[in-house]
C-alpha cells in the first residue's frame, strides 16, 4: 500500500479540502493511522495562537494521528492569493527541503499521509518554480479533484496531461459537485469517466457545510488500497 499521496485540483476552489476530508474519513473507517499534510496554505489568519489556515485546521481535525499545527502546515501565508505572491509579501522563501522533512516525519508516524496541494497543479511558489516540482521530487501518486462546473472537462483533461507529462501517476479522481445548479451533471460525469483512465474514487454531492459530517461513504478506496 502507498504511504502517501497528493491531492491536486483542477483549479482553485474546486473542493480539495472537501475531497480530502471524505478520503480521510474513508481511510479512518478502514482502521488506518492517517496524517494530513498541507505544506503551503495561503489566506491564513492570526487569531492569537499563531498564523493558521482554516483548511489546514480542518484537515488536522479529521486525520486521526495527533499532530501539532506546524507539522500539518509548515508554511501558513497570510494573503489569500497565489503562494508566490503571498510568500514574497512576507519575505518568505519556500524551501522544498522543509516540505520533504515534514513529509518524512509524518510518514514515520502514520500508515498513510494525505498531502493536499494549493490551487491548481501549476501553482507557483516563487517566480521560478511551482509546487508540482516538489511533488515530482517526492514521486507522489496523485488523486485529482474535479469541481463539477462549466469548463471542468477541459480543466480536468489538461491537468491530467500535465501530471502525466511530469512523470507522475494519477491513481484516482474525485468528482465534487461545487454548484447544486450545474446543468447536465450526469453527462459531465459520463464524459469524465470516458476520458480519465484512472478510476473514479467517488462523487461528492453539493454540501454547503462539511463540519461534523462523516463523508467516507462517498469514497471507494479499493483501487487505492491495491497500489
Curated annotation (Swiss-Prot):
Pathway stated in the Swiss-Prot or TrEMBL entry:
Cofactor biosynthesis; biotin biosynthesis; biotin from 7,8-diaminononanoate: step 1/2
Q: What is its EC number?
A: 6.3.3.3
Q: Where in the cell is it found?
A: Cytoplasm
* Annotated keywords: ATP-binding, Biotin biosynthesis, Cytoplasm, Ligase, Magnesium, Metal-binding, Nucleotide-binding
Q: Where is the active site?
A: 38
Keyword Metal-binding assigned? yes
**Biological process per Gene Ontology, one example term:** biotin biosynthetic process
- Which residues are Mg(2+)-binding? 17, 55, 116
Highest taxon of source: Bacteria
One Pfam family, short name:
AAA_26
Q: Where does ATP bind?
A: 13-18, 55, 116-119, 176-177
What is its cofactor?
Mg(2+)
* Keyword Metal-binding among UniProt keywords: yes
Subcellular location, principal: cytoplasm
Q: Which reaction does it catalyse?
A: (7R,8S)-7,8-diammoniononanoate + CO2 + ATP = (4R,5S)-dethiobiotin + ADP + phosphate + 3 H(+)
Which GO molecular function annotations are given, in alphabetical order? Answer: ATP binding; dethiobiotin synthase activity; magnesium ion binding
Q: Which GO terms describe its cellular component?
A: cytosol
NCBIfam families, from UniProt? bioD
Self-association state and partner proteins as the record states: Homodimer.
Q: Which family does it belong to?
A: Belongs to the dethiobiotin synthetase family.
Described function:
Catalyzes a mechanistically unusual reaction, the ATP-dependent insertion of CO2 between the N7 and N8 nitrogen atoms of 7,8-diaminopelargonic acid (DAPA, also called 7,8-diammoniononanoate) to form a ureido ring.
Instruction: Output this protein's name.
Output: ATP-dependent dethiobiotin synthetase BioD
- What taxonomic classification does the UniProt entry list for its organism? Bacteria, Pseudomonadati, Pseudomonadota, Gammaproteobacteria, Vibrionales
Amino acid at each position: 500500500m502507498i504511504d502517501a499521496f497528493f491531492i491536486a485540483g483542477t483549479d482553485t476552489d474546486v473542493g480539495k479540502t472537501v475531497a480530502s476530508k471524505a478520503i480521510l474519513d474513508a481511510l479512518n473507517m478502514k482502521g488506518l493511522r492517517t496524517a494530513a499534510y498541507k505544506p503551503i496554505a495561503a489566506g491564513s489568519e492570526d487569531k492569537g495562537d499563531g498564523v493558521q489556515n482554516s483548511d489546514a485546521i480542518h484537515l488536522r481535525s479529521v486525520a486521526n494521528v495527533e499532530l501539532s499545527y506546524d507539522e500539518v502546515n509548515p508554511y501558513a501565508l497570510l494573503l489569500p492569493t497565489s503562494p508566490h505572491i503571498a510568500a514574497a509579501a512576507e519575505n518568505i522563501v519556500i524551501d522544498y527541503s522543509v516540505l520533504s522533512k515534514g513529509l518524512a516525519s509524518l510518514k514515520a508516524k502514520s500508515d498513510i499521509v494525505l498531502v493536499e496541494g494549493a490551487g491548481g497543479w501549476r501553482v507557483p511558489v516563487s517566480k521560478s518554480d511551482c509546487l508540482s516540482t516538489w511533488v515530482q521530487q517526492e514521486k507522489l501518486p496523485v488523486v485529482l479533484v474535479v469541481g463539477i462546473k462549466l469548463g471542468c472537462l477541459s480543466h480536468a483533461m489538461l491537468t491530467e496531461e500535465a501530471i502525466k507529462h511530469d512523470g507522475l501517476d494519477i491513481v484516482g479522481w474525485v468528482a465534487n459537485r461545487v454548484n447544486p445548479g450545474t446543468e447536465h451533471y450526469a453527462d459531465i460525469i459520463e464524459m469524465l469517466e470516458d476520458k480519465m483512465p484512472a478510476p473514479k474514487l467517488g462523487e461528492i454531492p453539493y454540501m454547503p457545510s462539511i463540519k461534523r459530517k462523516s463523508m467516507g461513504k462517498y469514497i471507494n478506496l479499493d483501487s487505492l488500497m491495491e497500489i
